[in-house]
Amino acid sequence: MSNVKDMSLAPSGHLKMEWAKRHMPVLCRIAEEFKNDKPFEGLTIGMALHLEAKTAILAETLLEGGAKIVITGCNPLSTQDDVAAACVEKGMEVYAWRGETNEEYYENLNKVLDSNPDIIIDDGADLIFLIHTERTELIGKIMGGCEETTTGIIRLKSMAEEGALKFPVVNVNDAYTKHLFDNRYGTGQSAMDGIIRTTNLLIAGKNVVVGGYGWCGRGVASRAAGHGANVIITEVNPIRALEAKMDGFTVLKMEEAAKIGDIFVTTTGCKDILRMEHFLLMKDGAVLSNAGHFDNEINKNDLKELSKSVKEARFNIEEYDLGNKKIYLLGEGRLVNLACADGHPCEVMDMSFANQALSAKFIKENKGKLENEVYEIPYEQDFKIALLKLHSMGADIDELSPEQRKYLSDWKEGT
């Protein structure tokens, strides 16, 4: 029995799904294969992902492959209630709504696990972590899992290194056709979309501080610069900081950037990127946002401690009054691109979710053959998805001739 906010919203959700599907040709191609082959016949797939239109197309693809789908959200503010209702009408079991309390969030994760799933598809590893801590009775049944995001992979690799991981997990995040496009172009566009549509402020001429220069950070920096911002990067890794500098951005310590920033975007996957000492240095009217998976990159407890009052300044914007200045927090410090917008563009999620679908199939086909480790995506899978995407965009590539292949594998031929 599903539990969603309002089933009458389903027609709107179906429209969103149809729009997304039109722009996800690779996943649709895989759905056709799954419809014919039924690789998941008789299996239950438990999913915890941002429940919006693109995710729904992934779930529908797995449903076409014969799976029973039981799904919840992976963030209290990222579920779109109309899409959740539409998924129920599609025949999925859904436990999710926007604005869940922390208790409700974990209740819904447990509802997914109550279905006794065979395969897990996760974003942030909350579902997998819950299995390992509170629902250990499920470990023997689960064939494996797939993890979508950097934050989740960090957690899972730590578990694997300590010998705590009890079933194999495929690292979807590090697929070339995921992180080079989803993390960079997806996060860049959708984070700026969330900031702009929520604040209705001009970006041009403002100092935009980006915390972190991984693929997500460089995507945000690129798009902010495209809007005319003065982009400032903060980093802890000198190699990435050097890249940012040579890409033309200012690189500062956060304590210096805090003094001059107008808009802040954290993209690190780590906690306390913005904290008390930074809030004290910020100017009146500073806007804070987070594009990392969890809401701990901006220390909200520190911000509350410094504030005389907190109120809603506008939908999805909280005003923290520190007495001598006001600081504005977007989307409760949760993922700004999903809490304040519609998430990544359909075209990049087409590749990310194609990887999820094929990785779930990989787990099924290799049941009992995999160790309890974090596995990288096979190169052949990356290659297939990239080629399908290229063709869908009207592009094509050359092939090496036999002579070229021989040359590249022969150490004898030189100048």
UniProtKB/Swiss-Prot annotation:
Pathway named in the protein's UniProt entry: Amino-acid biosynthesis; S-adenosyl-L-methionine biosynthesis
Gene: ahcY
Role noted for this protein: Catalyzes the hydrolysis of S-inosyl-L-homocysteine (SIH) to L-homocysteine (Hcy) and inosine. Likely functions in a S-adenosyl-L-methionine (SAM) recycling pathway from S-adenosyl-L-homocysteine (SAH) produced from SAM-dependent methylation reactions. Can also catalyze the reverse reaction in vitro, i.e. the synthesis of SIH from Hcy and inosine.
The protein's Enzyme Commission number: 3.13.1.9
One annotated GO biological process: S-adenosylmethionine cycle
UniProt cross-references to SUPFAM superfamilies, sorted A to Z: Formate/glycerate dehydrogenase catalytic domain-like (SSF52283), NAD(P)-binding Rossmann-fold domains (SSF51735)
Annotated protein name in UniProt: S-inosyl-L-homocysteine hydrolase
GO molecular function list: adenosylhomocysteinase activity; trialkylsulfonium hydrolase activity
